[in-house]
Amino acid sequence: MTDVQIVDQLRSTLPADDDHPYRTGAWRPQSTEWHVDRVEVVEGAIPHDLDGLYARNTENPLHQPITRYHPFDGDGMVHAIRFRDGVATYRNRFVRTDGLLAEQESGTSLWAGLAENPRHAIRTDGRTARGSMKDASSTDLVVHGGEVLTSF
């Protein structure tokens, strides 16, 4: 039996009828963090000797950009599927960067995005060479010393 739990729901100010090509369809942002205890197997079976984790990092914007949007501007969300004893579990979590927390508090985008003019930034204390960009920590992940690390 599949047990689905909502872990957290982050505030999003994106419009419900958003039609930006990088925020619709398969690119549609998710603002909910989930835990699925037993993922339903649609066909076949998960081998009992399969033991491991598949993880990926994706971009999930929560707020309208200041002017222009590039997919790398979305906040990082790690998705993970854990396989053990013929069962798969799923979790997704936002990477809670300083930038994500500040924008959640303010309810708006604060830093200029990759395709924006840096002068449009509301805050200029970003982590990149431009200074006015948020490190969304959304494009890569590595495992080092038993920890999953994300990066811009």
Model segments located where?
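Beta-propeller domains
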Residues: M1-F152
